Amino acid sequence: MERFRIIDLPKIVDPRGNLTVAEQMKNIPFGIARVYWTYDVPSGERRGGHAHRTCEEIVIAVSGSFDVTVDDGRGHKEVYHLNHPYQGLYIGTGVWRTLEDFSSGAVCLVLASELFDEDEYIYEYDEFLEWAASPSPSQGGSV
């Protein structure tokens, strides 16, 4: 089971402007419980810096670009450069993520499988590594 990967969303090209659609349980592999976005990120700042115990997410650069580093805590780490509004990065449960190198005017849209719950976040990297090293039925995700 892939813990993170690029998902191509449909891109409908039209001379009046392009359109991309995200539909839960169709091209988004989970039910969408929460949508949020970050914008006006100052140069050099980072976002993220945490993992989710139970929440899955799709991260989309709806405008501009930024890099997302994902880490499964078991030696598999990748950096994705997001710059297309018709592509999303699926991040399953139990994956540490850091977002950085935001371009001017970048907007990061996130589709989440769960409502906000402070208790399901892991904010300390060392705690994340310990958690990732122990087998857990909540690790994985829909993809």
PLM regions with names:
Residues 1-87, 104-107, 111, 116-138, ...:
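Non-catalytic, conserved peripheral segments adjacent to functional cores
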Residues 84-89, 93-101:
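Well-ordered alpha/beta subsegment
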